[in-house]
Amino acid sequence: MEKPVTDRPSEAEVEAAVRTLLRWTGDNPDREGLIDTPKRVAKAFREMFGGYDMCPAEELGRTFEEVAGYDDLVIVKDIHFHSHCEHHMVPIIGKAHVGYLPDGKVVGLSKIARVVDIFAHRLQTQEALTAQIAGVIQDVLNPRGVAVMIEAEHMCMAMRGIRKQGSTTLTSTFTGVFKDTPEEQVRFVTMVRGGGA
């Protein structure tokens, strides 16, 4: 999964667009409290959408083959993230649970969390985020299978429209043996939910 290629506007163009949005809300972008808002928003957006400048596959490039014979399920759970809905550009706040069955090589645990962060720092749908995480791990590590579950609250449902605060959306995707073997799916979900293997 490569870095997306875009024709990125200049910082001055971004700041001008924010001034326009401030005027559109009915406020005055020249008042004291808003004078620096366009610059602050541009800086915040660069941070919140920094995933476009990173390649998640590169994070998985360094693997370890000497793991004392371990070849069973590896799960990194409760990876908290913030993303933004591609439809309304409002926050998605949630946590990801990522598991894989190694096939001779493992990756540092922090790299799994880093992959989640890179994709989360792009405009997203939860469904796409779930599939992207699983896809890059499957493509780069080539494990026997990958399982990803995401639980998230969408501010586009909480702050606008239907206004249902606290509702959570669950998505999951499975590759390899997880896709082919329902018992492996159950084992993953049971371990994520706090049960034994």
Curated annotation (Swiss-Prot):
GO molecular function, one term: zinc ion binding
Binding site for Zn(2+): C85, H88, C156
NCBIfam families with a match to the protein in the record: folE (TIGR00063), PRK09347.1-2 (NF006825), PRK09347.1-3 (NF006826)
Gene Ontology, cellular component aspect: cytoplasm
Domain of life the protein comes from: Bacteria
Record carries keyword Isomerase: no
Annotated pathway: Cofactor biosynthesis; 7,8-dihydroneopterin triphosphate biosynthesis; 7,8-dihydroneopterin triphosphate from GTP: step 1/1
Reactions catalysed according to its record: GTP + H2O = 7,8-dihydroneopterin 3'-triphosphate + formate + H(+)
Protein name, per record: GTP cyclohydrolase 1
PANTHER family noted in UniProt: GTP CYCLOHYDROLASE 1 (PTHR11109:SF7), GTP CYCLOHYDROLASE I (PTHR11109)
GO BP term, example: tetrahydrobiopterin biosynthetic process
SUPFAM superfamilies xref list: Tetrahydrobiopterin biosynthesis enzymes-like
Top EC group: hydrolase
Organism: Mesorhizobium japonicum (strain LMG 29417 / CECT 9101 / MAFF 303099)
E.C. code: 3.5.4.16
Annotated keywords: GTP-binding, Hydrolase, Metal-binding, Nucleotide-binding, One-carbon metabolism, Zinc
Any single Pfam family the record assigns to this protein: GTP_cyclohydroI
Keyword Secreted: no
Family according to the record: Belongs to the GTP cyclohydrolase I family.
Subunit structure comment from the entry: Toroid-shaped homodecamer, composed of two pentamers of five dimers.
